[in-house]
Amino acid sequence: MKNTINIQDQFLNQLRKEETTVTVFLLNGFQLRGLVKGFDNFTVLLEVDGRQQLIYKHAISTFAPQKNVKIEIE
């Protein structure tokens, strides 16, 4: 069976492990800036100014990290 690469999970996991500050753009235009503390198939847990916010992935447009994220996509 061929292993499938899940870029989304790798990207979010690197943001979490490296504690990289990220700006999350929502579909309604709202922006949140904070740290990814966890994620699953449907949600992302973001810490913003010391407070946790659970964001549904279907409401997210874009993740913009402060620095480049290294992931393996081979």
Curated annotation (Swiss-Prot):
It comes from the Bacteria. Signal peptide: none annotated. Residues 9-69 form the Sm domain. Gene3D superfamilies: 2.30.30.100. CDD domains: Hfq. GO terms for biological process: regulation of DNA-templated transcription; regulation of RNA stability; regulation of translation, ncRNA-mediated. RNA chaperone that binds small regulatory RNA (sRNAs) and mRNAs to facilitate mRNA translational regulation in response to envelope stress, environmental stress and changes in metabolite concentrations. Also binds with high specificity to tRNAs. Belongs to the Hfq family. Homohexamer. This is RNA-binding protein Hfq. It comes from Anoxybacillus flavithermus (strain DSM 21510 / WK1). The lineage of its organism: Bacteria, Bacillati, Bacillota, Bacilli, Bacillales.
